[in-house]
Amino acid sequence: MSISNSIRAQIPPIHPEGYPFIGGFALVSLILFWIFTPLGWIGTLLTVWCALFFRDPIRVTPQREGLVVAPADGRISMITRALPPAELGLGDRPLLRVSIFMSVFNVHVNRSPVAGRIEKISYRPGAFINAELDKASEDNERNSLAISTPHGKIGVVQIAGLVARRIVSFVREGQTVGAGERFGLIRFGSRLDVYLPDGTEVLVSEGQTAIAGETILADFDVATPGLTFRSQ
C-alpha cells in the first residue's frame, strides 16, 4: 500500500450532508486570508472542525438476532422508564428508555439499533432547550421512528438541542433496515432516545461511552448464540 493510500485509509469519509457547510467555511476562510491572515487561519481551523463533525467512519456492527446496538455516538446520559411519544403508537405505558447525548465533537450520523421494518416516521417541531434535560424528550423538535422486529416494536427518537437545529432522515416508512445501517443525522449536538419493550436486558450503564453501530445497548434474547460482525 502506498503512503497516500495509507494516509487516506486513516481519514474517515465525510457525509455528503456536510459538503455545503464545509464549502461555506472554506470560502469564508479564503476571504479572511485576503482581509487579515490570522483570521484566515481561524477560519481554516473552523473548516477542519466542520469536516470532523460530518465524518462518517466505517463501523463494525455485531450481527445476531435480538441485539440492540447504539444508534449514536455519545454518552449514555439516562436509563429510565418513560412514556414513548404518542405519535409512535407504542402504547400508553412507560417503556424502558436509553438516552444518548451527543456533543459537538461526536460523530452525528445515526444508525438503526436493530434490524427490522420502519412502521412509522413522525416529525414534530418544537423547542431547542438543552438536550440533556429530561423534558427535552417532550418539548424539543424531534423525529421519531417506530421499528418492527420479531421481538416487538422499538422507538428511536432524534431530538434537537441547543445547537442542533436540523434533523435529517435518510429512510422512509415501509423500508427495511439492518442493524447499524445509517438512517439519519442531527447537525451540531443533540440526543437520541431508544424505547425498548418490556423484558429487554440493558447491557450499558449511565455515563458509559457509546459508539454508533458497535456498542451493544441491550439484548432481547441473551440465550441466542452465534455472534458475527459486519463492516458498514
UniProtKB/Swiss-Prot annotation:
UniProt-listed Pfam families: PS_Dcarbxylase
InterPro entries: PS_Dcarbxylase, PSD-A
Keyword Transcription in annotation: no
Cofactor note: Binds 1 pyruvoyl group covalently per subunit.
Record localization: Cell membrane
Active site: 190 (schiff-base intermediate with substrate)
Keywords in alphabetical order: Cell membrane, Decarboxylase, Lipid biosynthesis, Lipid metabolism, Lyase, Membrane, Phospholipid biosynthesis, Phospholipid metabolism, Pyruvate, Zymogen
PTM annotation (Pyruvic acid (Ser)): residues: 190
GO BP annotations, alphabetical order: phosphatidylethanolamine biosynthetic process
Bilayer topology annotation: Peripheral membrane protein
Site (Cleavage (non-hydrolytic)) location in chain: 189-190
Keyword Mitochondrion: no
Top EC category: lyase
PTM field: Is synthesized initially as an inactive proenzyme. Formation of the active enzyme involves a self-maturation process in which the active site pyruvoyl group is generated from an internal serine residue via an autocatalytic post-translational modification. Two non-identical subunits are generated from the proenzyme in this reaction, and the pyruvate is formed at the N-terminus of the alpha chain, which is derived from the carboxyl end of the proenzyme.
UniProt GO MF annotations: phosphatidylserine decarboxylase activity
Catalytic activity from the UniProt record: a 1,2-diacyl-sn-glycero-3-phospho-L-serine + H(+) = a 1,2-diacyl-sn-glycero-3-phosphoethanolamine + CO2
Needed co-factor(s): pyruvate
Entry EC no(s): 4.1.1.65
Pathway: Phospholipid metabolism; phosphatidylethanolamine biosynthesis; phosphatidylethanolamine from CDP-diacylglycerol: step 2/2
Subunit structure: Heterodimer of a large membrane-associated beta subunit and a small pyruvoyl-containing alpha subunit.
Its job: Catalyzes the formation of phosphatidylethanolamine (PtdEtn) from phosphatidylserine (PtdSer).
Family assignment from sequence similarity: Belongs to the phosphatidylserine decarboxylase family. PSD-A subfamily.
Protein name as it appears in the record: Phosphatidylserine decarboxylase proenzyme
Organism of origin: Bradyrhizobium sp. (strain BTAi1 / ATCC BAA-1182)
Gene field: psd
